[in-house]
Amino acid sequence: MLKLLSLFTGIGAFEKALERLNIDYELVGFSEIDKFAIKSYCAIHNVPENKNLGDITKINIDKIPDFDLLTWGFPCQDISIAGRMEGIKKGTRSGLYYEGYKILKAKRPGISIIENVKNLTSKRFKEQFETILKDIEELGYNNYWQVLNAKNYSVPQNRERIFIVSIRKDIDKNNFVFPSPVELKLKLKDLLEDTVDDKFYLTENGIGRLIKKNNKLLKDCQNPNIS
């Protein structure tokens, strides 16, 4: 059975993918610090909280059991266009990449899968992206990467992400390809109800309060002394 170590776990998207692909796996551990994500993850995947290795910067690598697959989507805040774009450097959230890399280097599983924002492949971060590929290749892996959009895989969401699949050279058959797009059959109109519950409509009093509030905002915006 496939043995999995999950880093920067969140609520376990990779685990859900394995489940949907009917791939049996044994979780050797996961690393997550957000208390709500931890509770959600354990409930969704029926995992005891003592499987959580906690803060990735404090993990004792020597105590991690051997595993076959490493999944990690290190923080994107310093890469994302919505963040400060400081890049992957120590001291930043995205710099936690190096913590994941240390585990990969020490354990050398058969397969590593990294997920992150598309902006990692942009001109601004090209050098850092190439460094990641070089780092992993020097550990004895072949890298395969591609930017995929969720909407092309039957998910009603326009979300682009880069996936880096790294396969250890001694087991790589050099035939890995990313999956072909899947038609998106579920549309917004399929989710909308023909009849809407009255609770979703504003009452006459509610409409009046909204108009009054908007009028006040409009008046404030027209005030030349507003700061």
Give the role of each language-model region.
Residues K58-I61, A150-V155:
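A short acidic, often aromatic-flanked loop/helix-cap motif at beta-alpha or helix-coil junctions
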Residues E32, E115, E160-R161:
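Acidic-residue sensor for enzyme active/binding pockets
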Residues M1-L27, D135-L139, R161-S227:
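S-adenosyl-L-methionine-dependent DNA methyltransferase catalytic core
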Residues G110-I114:
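Conserved beta-strand signature within the Rossmann-like core of class I S-adenosyl-L-methionine
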Residues T71, W145-V147, R161-V165:
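Conserved hydrophobic/aromatic beta-strand scaffold that supports enzyme active sites
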Residues D66, P156-R161:
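A short, glycine/Asx- and small/polar-enriched loop/turn
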Residues L2-R108, K118-S122, K126-E130, E137:
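Core alpha/beta nucleotide-donor-binding catalytic domains of modification enzymes
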Residues L53-G54, K118, G140-N152:
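Conserved S-adenosyl-L-methionine
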